Regions:
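GH16 jelly-roll
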Residues: 162-410
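Compositionally biased, intrinsically disordered or flexible polar/acidic segments
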Residues: 6-163
Length: 410
């Protein structure tokens, strides 16, 4: 059960504690209550702002802040790993370099030199999210100043795992094997020619010409311009590949990564993502989806990370971020990752975070459903509503090379 006044769930299996810089409980846009932080905060002073904070539907969680050297001692029900989500915004007009602080958890620096203005700009929601191993009944957090005074609007803490173990890899595929061989049995090919509501041009096959190991430690998913009629009788103008780990590898929460070299070319749409195990048929989007990396060939320097879920009326929503690299991502291998925790998904490129989709920021009516097991998907689509159609410059073949995929948990 949940106490609306306290903002704390009492069920240890799904325990959460939500605290905000306020003298009274606050309700976010999704209807969840956040308790005043006085019971857990030490130091700092409450500062109120009327700044219009962008990037969130719950600006009150960012407008009121605790500023100054501050620490938190948060009681937790059991030893284990906890997700810590700090809700931050620069509402005081500080310029880059004028408010810089370290975030420590359990005495260890977990996020050094946080400068919210430099990260996202002024009056915009930002998040520092870490997974913390707690071995006793209290989670210790500290915001330690480097320049100026730290400022935090709210703290969200959630139990991830009651197993008191450090982050460790539970799945690691380096795609070793001879050229032309099928990938590990964890990856199962999906076949057929009706995808993307009929807007995509490819038929997915299990042929080695579309999906196989390359003999050099890579998985190759290759799209080919060719007429192909599949068993269902549909004829498509391209073939390609889609692999899923459903029924073989599923997980709830973790850090998922892939090192990939993506293709360029108008109309090509490589993606690495996670799909809810119950997503078949009409159950999408209710089962949830995390797009770790989506790229389109005509914009090869940009990568997008998104989450998808249902609205209160049953339609789908998408929320995410885009990162533009200094040069084309098709020129070499890059690591695309997502840190999935109970109330957030943080996307990164080559180890640098570029955006967090957070439950606290969703508008009313957008449901957060990312609390059930998901499995991995790798695919290379052609065309569709987002990628657009190939054109005269599009090469007739394109290959998504995957060097490694990993899943880490606690």
């Amino acid at each position: 059960m949940q106490s609306a006044a306290l903002g704390v769930t009492a069920n240890a299996a799904t325990w959460q504690g939500r605290y905000c810089a306020s003298t009274a409980a606050v309700r976010d846009a999704g209807g969840r209550m956040w308790a005043p932080d006085a019971a857990v905060a030490r130091g700092g002073q409450l500062v109120r702002s009327s700044a219009a904070v962008a990037g969130t539907s719950s600006p009150v969680l960012y407008q009121n802040q605790r500023q100054g050297p501050v620490s938190f001692a948060i009681p937790v029900p059991t030893a284990g790993t906890y997700a810590v989500d700090l809700l931050l915004a620069e509402t005081g007009g500080a310029q880059p370099g004028q408010r810089v602080f370290d975030v420590l958890a359990e005495g260890t620096v977990r996020a050094p030199s946080i400068d919210v203005e430099a990260r996202v700009g002024g009056a915009r929601a930002d998040h520092v999210v870490v997974a913390v191993l707690v071995t006793d009944g209290r989670l210790e957090l500290q915001l330690r100043p480097r320049v100026g005074v730290p400022a935090v609007g709210a703290v969200d803490v959630a139990l991830v795992s009651s197993t008191a173990t450090a982050e460790h890899t539970v799945f690691d595929d380096t795609f070793a094997g001879p050229a032309g061989a099928a990938p590990d049995a964890a990856w199962q090919p999906q076949t057929g020619g009706r995808w993307g509501g009929g807007a995509e041009l490819q038929a997915y096959t299990a042929r080695a010409s579309n999906v196989s190991l390359d003999g050099s430690g890579h998985l190759a998913l290759t799209a080919r311009r060719e007429s192909y009629t599949g068993p269902e009788g549909a004829t498509n103008s391209y073939t390609s590949a889609r692999l899923e780990t459903g029924g073989r590898l599923s997980f709830r929460y973790g850090r998922v990564s892939a090192s990939m070299r993506v293709p360029a070319g108008a109309g090509y749409w490589p993606a690495f993502w996670a799909l809810g195990d119950a997503a078949g048929g009409a159950q999408w989007p209710s089962a949830g989806e995390i797009d770790v990396a989506e790229l389109i060939g005509q914009r090869p320097a940009a990568v997008d990370g998104h989450v998808h879920g249902p609205t209160a009326t049953g339609t789908a929503y998408g929320s995410g971020y885009e990162r533009t690299a200094p040069s084309s991502l098709a020129l070499g291998f890059h690591t695309y990752s997502a840190l999935w925790l109970p109330d957030s998904v943080t996307f990164s490129l080559d180890g640098k975070d570029y955006g967090t989709v957070d439950r606290a920021d969703l508008p009313a009516g957008q449901r957060w459903v990312l609390d059930q097991p998901e499995h991995l998907v790798l695919n290379l689509a052609v065309g569709g509503s987002w990628a657009g159609a190939p054109d005269a410059s599009t090469p007739p073949t394109a290959t998504l090379l995957v060097d490694r995929t990993t899943v880490a948990r606690w």
